[in-house]
Amino acid sequence: MSIMGLKVNVSAIFMAVLLTLQTPTGQIHWGNLSKIGVVGIGSASYKVMTRSSHQSLVIKLMPNITLLNNCTRVEIAEYRRLLRTVLEPIRDALNAMTQNIRLVQSVASSRRHKRFAGVVLAGAALGVATAAQITAGIALHQSMLSSQAIDNLRASLETTNQAIEAIRQAGQEMILAVQGVQDYINNELIPSMNQLSCDLIGQKLGLKLLRYYTEILSLFGPSLRDPISAEISIQALSYALGGDINKVLEKLGYSGGDLLGILESRGIKARITHVDTESYFIVLSIAYPTLSEIKEVIVHRLEGVSYNIGSQEWYTTVPKYVATQGYLISNFDESSCTFMPEGTVCSQNALYPMSPLLQECLRGSTKSCARTLVSGSFGNRFILSQGNLIANCASILCKCYTTGTIIRQDPDKILTYIAADHCPVVEVNGVTIQVGSRRYPDAVDLHRIDLGPPISLERLDVGTNLGSAIAKLEDAKELLESSDQILRSMKGLSSTSIVYILIAVCLGGLIGIPALICCCRGRCNKKGE
């Protein structure tokens, strides 16, 4: 008696645990979704990039070689020639745009003084320009340094011999100046001047400058096609900055905790605003955004496993990503987003409305979840979730590695859930997996679950189904038209005629029904005799 009671208690506890696991967590009912092969494989916070901050960065292409002038004149002359081939086309394109942008000023009637109203683009003089180029041209004008600032910057760059230096100008923001080969000159060539011959120093510097020029060409080469609207990522800039991207970002004043997310999402961009072919430097406007976390929004990633109904293989059609906020479930467009362990970073709002039927599906109504037949090669026939293996063992070979036996899936089961109590180590599709304690029921019976409507995602099938639906609509239209004709003909009858017809029908019924009854009785009597 005690043994039977113990078994009952253990069974009750086990079922209670399973019921707890099947309850929805938040808005999405993971328990019911797992019955049709849909599981969540990760959740993360949601962050959106907000308005960018701007700062100027100068790439000083010509290093300070005052102490090496006697040994490097030939190499420097060749290096300058190469730089001009890159810089002059960019300079000409920038000048062509900025010369056709002028200030618009208006005169206030009260104080009779001019005030700035904006900028206007001289389209007639410019000729052909795309919308992106026009927008970039206006932004270029607004971020340009004044001619006086350029002169001051040129003078400061000629005297500095630091690889990275912050230059502050009166009344203006700090400008960061970077030279990619200055550290090499300061730390390797100058200390070894007494040990190396002049020719060898020139050769070493020439090779270093040639390599640096190659990096500059790969960085700014695409800008030769469209210098106005071309954007450069900070990762690409790191090559021209000597590879020390962290030091540069620190000098720029960026200390946000989401730096990794912005870097991975390539949110930091640079645009050329000035090219100087006299002192060989490029001025860039660096835009680096801040991140705003949208509170209470969680992004979930979904994965599906195929399941079998008889000889047919199906899978549930759900989005790859969804987002929850309060009771609301939204679709999530991941095209502009980067996914990291710390959260999801998007360059723009990625949420958009979800249909009520799909929301019902995700909340646990499996009959609202559309399904489609597997065609060709399907990605997932097994998946590991919460330490348990969810597998479609009717389509792939499932084997218990511990005992060497085949794990079979009964025809009335749509999926198999394998845990350590069933088989500690499983071999599925050639992959050996060690599973954990049970988190899901052993299997899901087909007759215990309501499946959703079948749909087709193949283009040919969709077209065929659409054609069939149109044909049925045309048939229904013809039937409606014929019924309208009958109704119109009925309208032509007078009310008196309708009354006569009804009386005749009633009299016919009163006479016909008794006659029919008498005939039936007569036949029954004959059979009885």
Curated annotation (Swiss-Prot):
Residues 370-447 are annotated as: Interaction with hemagglutinin. It is found in: Virion membrane; Host cell membrane. Residues 27-490 are extracellular. Its main location: virion. The record marks R115, F116 as: Cleavage. Residues 142-218 are annotated as: HRA. It comes from the Viruses. Contains 3 heptad repreat regions, HRA, HRB and HRC. The chain crosses the membrane at residues 491-521. Homotrimer of disulfide-linked F1-F2. Residues 1-26 form the signal peptide. This is Fusion glycoprotein F0. It comes from Measles virus (strain IP-3-Ca) (MeV). GO terms for cellular component: host cell plasma membrane; membrane; viral envelope; virion membrane. GO terms for biological process: fusion of virus membrane with host plasma membrane; symbiont entry into host cell. Belongs to the paramyxoviruses fusion glycoprotein family. InterPro entries: Fusion_F0_Paramyxovir (IPR000776). Glycans are attached at N32, N64, N70.
